[in-house]
Design a protein with these regions (language model features):
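Transmembrane helix-loop-helix hairpins at the membrane interface
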Residues: 92-246, 357, 458, 724-729, ...
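Conserved catalytic phosphorylation-site environment of P-type ATPases
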Residues: 295, 354, 389, 402-476, ...
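Flexible metal-binding regulatory segments at protein termini and peripheral loops
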Residues: 1-133, 229, 254-257, 339-347, ...
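Membrane-embedded alpha-helical bundles of multi-pass transporters
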Residues: 116-130, 159, 178, 417, ...
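Juxtamembrane coupling segments of multi-pass membrane pumps/enzymes
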Residues: 196-197, 212-273, 304, 354, ...
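ATP-driven catalytic headpiece of P-type ATPases
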Residues: 95, 314, 438-481, 511-594, ...
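Conserved cytosolic catalytic loops of P-type ATPases
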Residues: 26-43, 48, 205-206, 237-331, ...
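Conserved ATP-binding TGD loop and adjacent catalytic N/P-domain core of P-type ATPases
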Residues: 347, 437, 519-521, 553-555, ...
Length: 851
């Protein structure tokens, strides 16, 4: 996505105009304009020159966000150009406002002070109404020149056929000035004719103060809005300021301070107590505790020793450490966070489309309503001055800005709150949609559990000893990247077993099943029970012993040598301390929690019981996880939470994917939301924040719509006959100036929202059905069978299988040569195979499968 800075936008109508102009270009796939940050993100093959020309043809200005050498270097280091977030608008508006108020006070003194309160006037004006009118015209004209931006932008947009908020202000103020100037000319004629009564009558037809007050009050509102908008990006600006500007490199035995841009991958840098870590890396020497709250929101310092990872912008609290740089510039964790938050602000939430559609026709509709209002009052016999006042009031009270800001300000603040708490939403869509979750599907390892499994039991088969078993296991597992493999290799190395000579040939990893390879002439295999049963026999007594370990939540890894079972290594991964509470919070929100794991049913049920999860789908291979998510999506909104490579397809397939921050880069890339902490409680926090943000957007949209629905008829004088109410255009301008300020202020309330407080959680009722989950939770095996020729064969095989202890049912299809067996407990492949082959059919294969 290329990013551009857009200038000249003043309201939602401008935003819509720019989006339409760029979206029409050939090669533009997507265009999102942010009125909040005055930026535009464009996807596609269109050139930057074409895009900039399209924006300029629409009446606005544009330039690439990284446009010069200095900005480019800054962007490389931080991942985003910080200058675009600086508040350049408020100082300019402040100067305009001070100048306008100075002249406005004099104007109000002249126009109202003498008449209402008897304030003295200069001699040349006392009793000279024409002189008073000329002074008012000059003062009003000066104020309008000071605020000429409204007129330049407004009439320019009108000429381009895309009127905006500035057009409404310019028409309202300009009409007041033009009418008053006409009255002044008429008054001059009356005075020359000696018609004193007519001169007195004309004196009450002046609207010079309204013309000046309108632009001044709108400037007040614009300044309040600009200051509030600046606060919405405080979180992002705060993160940017965390980036250290220098680093201390250790070269040739000496310390040397250099600009952060000069640090390269592989450099050794030192971090002293109290200093910020400059780039990502790992500790080579020393020990310390590091405050990572800037990235994760977690206030408790983390102990670091040799080999541990450190991240840029975290603070070294205690020891002196030497580190080696692994990621610098835009690749650091900090830069990625900044980029994610910035990119999210540049995207558009689906709910914003409502406001966009209205904004596209809002200003032309208001101008039409204003003209109709004037025409109606003239037709019913009211004087031109009264009709004009009603038409001007309609123009200046209408506010498309409130509509345009309703969604993006809430998205920006919500993203900032998330970033401060270690919850990163990649897009506005993910921030809006996460809170709509009906099902939260959790991977087991590293998500519910700590992801740091340890060997707990060694069960040796007959004819083998423990040393031989763990050498077989270590020889295989050292080639695997699975978390369980690391647990085994750590255990083997801890026992002092030398694996340097254990070089395998023909090594292969079968996803979701196991490993195999040859050590010289010896064939080795390791994995789950179904996998090992293809290579070795497992007697029933041994299997029962292992089932008991599985019921305790331990994962059994079987190993065999040359077709003989060598034994089992049982590995346990304890659940995270906060997992049970996190799942309880999700349940209290009305969300169905599902555990989805490749582990066997007994282990999965044990972990689920500890965590308080009612729905378990076990024995699922990596490709099967994606299939489960697809089926579950037919029943409601699905959020998938995972941390591993195997979870990436499921994360992508889900309505929303949430990656645990300590997980793999692949999982993080596939996800829509990233949790910088590895705490499961942050899942409920993300959903809670999403719901709060969406609620805030609804409040903003309601205010923006209801304000215009009530305000425009009031300004038009629709209620005069019922209530006698009329609205002075000045009060209309005041209301307009405050409307956007109210919307932005409401969005800023999100900064006070506690994402971890479950006290106000509401249990949203969904029509969730658990039939699918219960069906998928059953253990199933698929058997390919040869020799079945007819319905009688089907019935024979079905009866044989259903007589096996542990088989709930068997669905047999002789045409496909397949039997699907549903189990109530673990049943070995050999037992099922024997039951069928005793009936003189041939079993080609047996496998656990998800359907």
């Amino acid at each position: 996505m290329e990013k551009y800075i857009v200038t000249g936008m003043s309201c939602a109508a401008c935003q819509t105009r720019v989006e339409k102009a760029v979206s029409k270009l050939p090669g533009v796939d997507n265009c999102a304009v942010s009125l909040l940050t005055n930026t535009m993100g464009v996807d596609g093959s269109a050139s930057s020159a074409e895009i900039i020309k399209a924006v300029e043809d629409a009446g606005y200005g544009a330039k690439l966000q990284v446009a010069d050498e200095e900005d480019a270097q800054s962007a490389i280091q931080s991942g985003v150009n910080e200058s675009i977030l600086e508040d350049h608008e408020t100082p300019v508006l402040k100067k305009r406002l001070i100048s306008s108020l100075g002249f406005l006070l004099v104007l109000m003194y002249v126009s109202m002070g003498h008449m209402m309160w008897g304030f003295p006037l200069p001699g040349f004006m006392d009793g000279n109404h024409v002189a008073m009118g000329i002074v008012q015209m000059l003062l009003s004209g000066i104020i309008m020149v000071i605020n000429q931006k409204f007129f330049v932008s407004g009439f320019k947009s009108l000429i381009h056929g895309a009127p905006n908020m500035d057009t409404l202000v310019a028409l309202g103020s300009g009409a007041s000035f033009a009418w008053s100037s006409y009255v002044l000319l008429a008054m001059t004629g009356a005075q020359l004719a000696g018609d004193t009564a007519q001169v007195e009558a004309y004196m009450h037809e002046f609207y010079f103060e309204s013309a000046a007050m309108i632009v001044t009050l709108i400037t007040v509102g614009k300044m309040l809005e600009a200051r509030s908008k600046g606060k919405t990006t405080d979180a992002l600006k705060g993160i940017m300021k965390l980036a250290p500007k220098t680093a201390i490199l250790f070269e040739n035995g000496e310390e040397k301070e250099v600009p952060i841009e000069q640090v390269k991958i592989g450099d050794i840098f030192v971090v002293k107590p109290g200093a910020s870590i400059p780039v990502d890396g790992f500790v080579e020497e020393g020990e310390s505790s590091v405050d990572e709250s800037a990235l994760t929101g977690e206030s408790i310092p983390v102990d670091k020793t040799a080999g541990d990872q450190v991240s840029a912008a975290t603070v070294n609290q205690a020891g002196y450490i030497k580190c080696r740089a692994t990621r610098v510039g835009k690749d650091t964790t900090l830069s990625k966070i900044i980029s994610m938050v910035s990119d999210a602000a540049a995207t558009k939430a689906p709910i914003a489309k409502i406001a966009d559609k209205v904004s596209g026709v809002f200003v032309p509709a208001v101008i039409a309503i204003s003209l109709v209002t004037m025409a109606i009052w003239l037709l019913v016999g009211r004087e031109l001055g009264f009709a004009l006042a009603r038409g001007i009031a309609v123009l200046v009270i209408s506010c498309p800005c409130a509509l345009g800001l309703a969604t993006p300000v809430s998205i920006m603040v919500g993203n900032g709150v998330g970033a401060r708490n270690g919850i990163l939403f990649k897009t506005a869509v993910s921030l809006e949609e996460t809170g709509k979750a009906q099902y939260v599907v959790l991977d087991k390892t590293g998500t519910i559990t700590e992801g740091n499994p340890k060997v707990k039991d060694i069960v040796v088969a007959d004819g083998f000893d423990e040393e031989r078993l763990i050498k077989i296991a270590g020889s295989l597992e050292k080639y695997s990247e699975h978390p369980l493999a690391k647990a085994v290799t750590d255990y083997v190395q801890g026992k002092g077993v030398d694996l340097s000579s254990s070089e395998l040939t023909g090594f292969a990893a079968v996803a979701g099943n196991g490993l195999k390879g040859k050590l010289g002439e010896i064939e080795l295999a390791g994995g789950n029970r179904d996998f090992i049963e293809k290579y070795a026999d497992i007697n029933e007594d041994f299997a029962n012993r292992i089932d008991q370990l599985s019921k305790e939540g331990k994962t059994a890894l079987y190993f065999c040598e040359n077709g003989r079972l060598a034994g089992v290594i049982a590995v346990a991964d304890p659940i995270k301390e906060e997992s049970a509470q996190a799942i309880k919070e999700l349940d209290n929100m009305g969300i169905e929690v599902v555990m989805l794991t490749g582990d066997n049913q007994l282990v999965a049920e044990s972990i689920a019981k500890q965590a308080g999860i009612k729905n378990v789908i076990a024995g699922v291979k990596p490709d099967g996880k994606e299939e489960v998510i697809s089926n579950l999506k037919k029943r409601g909104k699905v959020v998938m939470v995972g941390d591993g490579i195997n979870d990436a397809p499921a994360l992508t397939r889900a309505d929303m994917g949430i990656a645990i921050g300590a997980g793999t880069d692949i999982a993080i890339d596939a996800a829509d939301v990233v949790l910088m902490n590895s705490k499961l409680s942050d899942v409920s926090a993300a959903i809670r924040l999403s719901r709060a943000t969406l609620r805030n957007i609804h409040e903003n949209l309601f205010w923006a719509f209801i304000y215009n629905v009530i305000g425009i008829p009031l300004a038009a004088g629709a209620w005069i006959h019922l209530t006698g109410w009329t609205m002075n255009p000045m009060f209309g301008a005041l209301a307009m100036s405050l409307s956007s300020f109210c919307v932005v202020s409401n969005a800023l309330r999100l900064n006070l929202f506690d994402v971890h407080s479950a006290s106000k959680d509401k249990k949203i009722k969904f029509n969730n059905t658990n039939d699918f989950i219960e069906e998928e939770s059953e253990m199933k095996k698929k058997m390919e069978i040869e020799g079945m020729m007819c319905g009688h064969c089907e019935a024979t095989v079905k009866k044989a299988l259903e007589e096996v202890d542990g088989v709930k049912s068997a669905d047999v299809n002789h045409k496909k040569g397949v039997a699907v067996v549903k189990l109530s407990k673990e049943v070995s492949d050999d037992i099922l195979k024997k039951a069928v082959e005793d009936k003189e059919y041939v079993v080609k294969s047996v496998e656990s499968k998800l359907f």
